[in-house]
Amino acid sequence: METIDLIIVIVYLLAIVIVGLVMQKKASRDIDSYFLGNRKLPWWVLGASGMASNTDIAGTMINTAFIYALGTKGFFIEIRGGVTLIMAFLMVFMGKWNRRSKVMTQAEWMHFRFGKGKEGDTARIIAAFASIVMTIAMVTYFVIGAGKFVGEFLGIEPIYASLLMVVLAMTYTVASGLYGVVWTDVFQGVFIFGVIVYISGMAMSTVTLPEEFMVSVPMLDGSFTAIKTSLSEWSRITPPSEMNMPTGSTFEIYNLFGIAIMFYLFKVTLEGSSGAGGYMLQRYFAAQSDREAGLLSLFWTSLLAFRWPLIASFAMLGIHHGLNPEFSVIADPELVLPTVIKHYIPTGVKGFLIAGLMAAAMSTFDSTVNAGAAYWVKDLYQTYLRPNATEKDLMLQGRIASLVIVAF
């Protein structure tokens, strides 16, 4: 990157830390303020934070790869999670039901649901440990994916890029809890939205896809195979019942496309009927009222819809790149995103784009860590290890738990 791009990224990172630290005083009263913002955060802040947390670099790269290789069929595959259909259940039913429980975590909900006897204790402990393990796994996924992407553009090793983002995000997450998380997410959401508008505008004004073109799919042996597709097939709105991916392709599992989509839809329905978990559920526990739980869902979903024009635009620019005689078809679909940024984003704008994608990574990371730490403090430490712990002690445990989760 050029010097101006690096300056933009550095200024952005410093601004994020400052915004987060400003919220430290509000989050230092007790664990309710640290993990739920005293249940006084506006619905639009919680909704914007949710959108930012749902948008991460690794997920954007994977979804772009699907759309690039499969067209709109990739969108249907992401019914498994990327489309976040679970928000429909949260908006209509589960969001307000979870908020009414007045609990802090999904594990504490187990006591609310099954009682405080042996069954409830068992369910709560299992839920707490499972949630902590999942938090560590998700943090690892986010950090590795973001580190590879950011390291390439900053010109440093992926491990150092990951470490940079982790240290900065942990600075305000540990200090200011959910207050710092949601307000920095709002700030980062502005960057993300700016990126969406710019890339979508560029794709619409630059790209005209021909009737037939080549894309590429990954193979099980690590190689890649170029395949021909048509514009009508790539952009068809209705999903087919079957696909014809090459034998030995990692996408071959989707050849029985209709069955795969029905399975994912059934899976999301089951998950939605039982409510979400992690940082998604935390936003509803923090809502001020049933009405605001519904409003934050609507706002969250509306903002998240803009993620897909961004992903489709990156995919279109990736195909456009392969049509250029100076280049060849992008072999690895997961390299579409960095390739487009490298070849099509001008100096200055590239700095804002990298900052926006770093914002997406950090917002997902900080939300996951803050929600995960609550399981240790509320469900294990306060409930079973030190029931009479002071608020000061619980706050200390919350900060230590955040650090330990990242260290693992």
Task: Cite the ranges covered by each PLM segment.
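A generic, lipid-embedded transmembrane alpha helix
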Residues: 39-65, 137, 304, 405-408
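Extracellular loop-to-transmembrane helix junctions
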Residues: 2-24, 37, 45, 65-108, ...
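Residue-level recognition of transmembrane alpha-helices
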Residues: 50, 79-80, 162-166, 185, ...
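Residue-level recognition of pore/gate-forming positions within transmembrane alpha-helices
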Residues: 13-16, 53-54, 83-87, 131-132, ...
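Helix-loop-helix module between adjacent transmembrane segments
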Residues: 52, 75-174, 245, 263-271, ...
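Loop-to-helix junctions at membrane interfaces in multi-pass transport proteins
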Residues: 38-41, 45, 62-78, 190-351
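Loop-to-transmembrane helix boundary motifs in multi-pass membrane proteins
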Residues: 113-128, 132, 136, 377-408
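Juxtamembrane interface elements at the cytosolic ends of transmembrane helices
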Residues: 14-30, 93-107, 171, 175-178, ...
